[in-house]
């Protein structure tokens, strides 16, 4: 496609610079054929946005609340590669908002952070989830209560698949008391604007968060 910038009260020189910037932002599919002496000032694609709070990019880093109980268990999540939420539309809708490629930091209430992973398949009702050719509910889950309300779309558990990049047992959860680390009772929350928590996650799990984001 051809992109043309229309602006008022800009010199030709300034308008060209604005146009070049917009072309850069529009991504890898467009080529900026006007190079000039400003070319060296443009960062590589998919780099600057990873360090800018609130920048619009494809995937994000999110806090995920494990919420252990009768229908969910961290051991199951870690062993089989998934996360879940359900029991009501307010929790269902939160897990449905995860996108493929999002990075999640799993938090276990009363313990700390227990894993970092990448969403590989968006959430669907647990009754529809097939894992390695078998229904998830056919596996020997620690919490078989996951099958509760399986035919009720409002109350059913919803499951998203995850590729765990780093995990620990619940007893080894990563936490630092009175340090201001971010937590919330929500199922999902952005870790944008939480630099201290992100830094703690990176050091605790020996991962570079920007390198994980697409």
Where are the predicted features?
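Contiguous surface segments at macromolecular interaction interfaces
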Residues: 28, 39-69, 84-90, 127-214
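Short, well-ordered loop/turn sites that connect or cap secondary structure elements
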Residues: 95-99
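Short beta-strand-centered aromatic/proline hotspots
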Residues: 113-125
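Structure-specific nucleic-acid interaction/processing domains
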Residues: 1-54
